Amino acid sequence: MKALQFGAGNIGRGFIGKTLSESGFSVIFSDVNQNIVDAINYNREYFVKIIGSNQNKTVNIKRVSAINSNDSNIKKIISSVDLITTAVGPTALEKIALIITQGIIFKIKNQFTKPLNIIACENKIKSSSFLKQVVLKNLPIKYHDYLNKYIGFIDCSIDTIIPSINNKDDLFLTVEEFKEWIVNINQFKGAVLKIVDMKFSNNLDAFIERKLFTLNTGHAIAAYLGLIKNYKTIQDAISDKKIRVIVRSAMEESGSVLIKRYNFNKNDHLDYIEKIFLRFENPFLSDKLERIGRNPLQKLRREDRLIKPFLGAFEYNLPYSNLAKGIAAAFYYHNKNDLESIELSSSIKKQGLESTIIKICDLPVNSKEVYSIILEYNLIKKIIR
C-alpha cells in the first residue's frame, strides 16, 4: 500500500506519516520545502519522540520518500497511490486541489480504476468535502462520473499537539502520546483502509466541532492573551491565573454550545476539557505562542475556532463573555513577523476596529456580536493586567 502525504511539517510527519508508516504504508511526502524533501530522500527514515504521562519513547519511521510539490512527476504518483492525505493548512488546499486534479486526469487517461481515497487533515470543518468541490471546479465535466465512482473524499477530525522544538536533526519531532483520528466511514470508495488507531463515525460533525471548539479555541485564546503579556510558551500563559480562568471559562462557554447542539454529556465534556488542560500543561510539549497564534485572519473567520462557537452561544442564548475576550485579544495582538497580523493591524488602523471586525469575521453591521467584541477590546489591558 502506498500513500502520498501533502505537507511534510509537524502534523504531516509526526502524526499522519508516522501513523501511515505504522499501518504498513510506504509514505511519499510532498512539500515545497526542498531542504525537507532532500533530507527525507537522503535519510529514508526519521525519528519521533513520543511524550507520555508515564514514559517516553523514540520510534523510527521508515519506508518514506519525498517529492517537491512542483515536480511534474507528482501526477504519476497521484495516479498510483491508494491514499492521499494533507496537512498543509486550510489556505493552501486550493493549490493542492489543482495538483490533485492533474493527477486524477492522468489516472483517467491511463484507464486506472483502482479506488483512490483522499483525507484532508486540516483545521477546517469538512475540509475533504471542500477539497472535492475545488477539484470538481477544475476537473472537466466529462470526468465527473469517474471521480464520483472511484475517488473518495473522506472528512475527518484530527487531534494531537506537536510543538515546534529546535533540534540538530531537521526531521526529528517530539509529539504527545494522545492522538485522535476520526473519519466518516460512509465516504470511502472501495474497501475501507486499515489504519492504526483510526476511528470511524457516522456523526463526524460532532467530533469535528468538539475538537475545534475545545482544543483549538482554548489554544488560540491562551496564545493571544499570553502574547499580549509577552509570554513565550503555552505553559507560561496557562500558569497566569487570570489567563487560565479566561481560557477555561471560554472552553466551558464553547462546551455549552456543543452540549446544546449535539446533546453531549456535560460531565464527560468537562472531563474532556480537563484532559486538554493537562496536555497544555505538559512541560515536555513546550509549544511557542507565536506558532499557535500565527495567521490570525484565518483563525478569526466565521467558520473557525473563535467566531463559530461565539456565534453558537448567541444562537442558543448562552454565555459568551470569555469567548469575546479571546476574540478581542486576537484583534489586539500584533506580530511584525506575521503577514496576517500585519494586515489585520493595518486594517484596524485604516478602516477602524468595527469595520475590520465586520469584514474579517463576516458579522452583521450594528450587531450585539460586534459591539461585545469592541467592548472587550477596549478593556483588554484591564482584563489581563
Curated annotation (Swiss-Prot):
Protein's recorded name: Mannitol-1-phosphate 5-dehydrogenase
Entry-linked PANTHER family: ALTRONATE OXIDOREDUCTASE-RELATED, MANNITOL-1-PHOSPHATE 5-DEHYDROGENASE
InterPro entries on file: 6-PGluconate_DH-like_C_sf (IPR008927), 6PGD_dom2 (IPR013328), Mannitol_1_phos_5_DH (IPR023028), Mannitol_DH (IPR000669), Mannitol_DH_C (IPR013118), Mannitol_DH_N (IPR013131), NAD(P)-bd_dom_sf (IPR036291)
Reactions catalysed according to its record: D-mannitol 1-phosphate + NAD(+) = beta-D-fructose 6-phosphate + NADH + H(+)
NCBIfam families in the record: PRK02318.1-2, PRK02318.2-2, PRK02318.2-5
EC numbers on record: 1.1.1.17
Keywords: NAD, Oxidoreductase
Lineage, top ranks: Bacteria, Pseudomonadati, Pseudomonadota, Gammaproteobacteria, Enterobacterales
Gene Ontology cellular-component annotations: cytosol
